[in-house]
């Protein structure tokens, strides 16, 4: 669950680029015959006010990203041949009637997945973990300790404590099968979990906002897990548009 707070974050477009051919969408019109060279990260939007900011963070690292609704059919997601998926946060509880849902089979595509806030809770519930209302709602700055030294998502700061931005009322109480804890908050709630074999990662906080001190490193590590490389920038896009 995500609070629609008073904080506003600048929106914008940074760099993006890549490797894989995709089906249809803005990138097809943008790249034309060169689309086969485009790598991309797909972001499934569960309604977060920060979803555009997630896309910006990825693009700023030179990797193309696209945002799709959370309920996008599995076949359409597969047609994009993404290098990785990011599941956004959202304002709902996973227990709310009509709360956003994705096809659980998106977790079986064999590509890396990063769940954020609601995305983490959705993963936990979809894979058989226990998600419950938190005893105390976490909102605002929260200290988090990395508890898994060899976590690829937290590469570069194992054992470290860092400030994060939390905004949730539900939490994962019991891990899904095959998952391990990778970070915990000072209030003793689970802050991150992962299944290294399936390359599914999830964080309860928001790495996309500047309030999270090392959020950029988390995105950089996730893109490394996905095996994507930057190489396309906004200047190329401007040149392309001028030639149209």
Label each residue range with its predicted role:
Residues 33-84, 93, 101, 107-109, ...:
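RNA-binding accessory domains that recognize and position tRNA/RNA substrates
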Residues 20, 24, 156-157:
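Short, intrinsically disordered, low-complexity terminal segments
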Residues 115, 119, 124:
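Gly/Ala-rich beta-loop-alpha elbow adjacent to hydrolase catalytic centers
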Residues 26-31:
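Short, low-complexity intrinsically disordered segments enriched in A/P/G/S/L with frequent Arg
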Residues 3, 7-9, 16, 20-22:
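Cationic, low-complexity basic patches in intrinsically disordered or flexible, solvent-exposed regions
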Residues 110-114:
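Conserved pre-ATP/AMP-binding loop-to-beta segment of ANL
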Residues 86-88:
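Structural motif
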């Amino acid at each position: 669950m995500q609070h629609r707070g008073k904080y506003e974050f600048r929106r914008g477009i940074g760099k993006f680029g890549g490797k894989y051919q995709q089906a249809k969408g803005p990138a097809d019109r943008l790249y034309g015959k060169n689309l086969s060279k485009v790598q991309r990260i797909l972001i499934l939007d569960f309604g977060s006010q920060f979803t555009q900011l997630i896309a910006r963070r990825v693009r700023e690292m030179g990797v193309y990203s696209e945002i799709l609704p959370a309920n996008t059919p599995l076949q359409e997601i597969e047609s994009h041949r993404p290098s990785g998926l990011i599941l956004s946060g959202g304002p709902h509880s996973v227990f709310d009637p009509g709360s956003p849902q994705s096809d659980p089979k998106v977790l079986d595509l064999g590509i890396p997945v990063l769940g954020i806030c609601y995305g983490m809770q959705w993963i936990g519930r979809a894979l058989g973990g226990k998600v419950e209302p938190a005893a105390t709602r976490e909102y605002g700055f929260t200290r988090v300790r990395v508890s898994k030294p060899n976590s690829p998502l937290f590469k570069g700061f194992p054992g470290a404590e860092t400030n994060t931005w939390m905004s949730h009322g539900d939490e994962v109480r019991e891990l899904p099968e095959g998952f391990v804890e990778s970070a915990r908050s000072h209030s003793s709630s689970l802050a991150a979990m992962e299944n290294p074999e399936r390359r599914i990662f999830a964080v309860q906080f928001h790495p996309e906002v500047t309030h999270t001190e090392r959020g950029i490193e988390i995105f950089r590590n996730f893109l490394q897990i996905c095996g994507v490389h930057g190489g396309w920038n906004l200047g190329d896009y401007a040149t392309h548009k001028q030639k149209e």
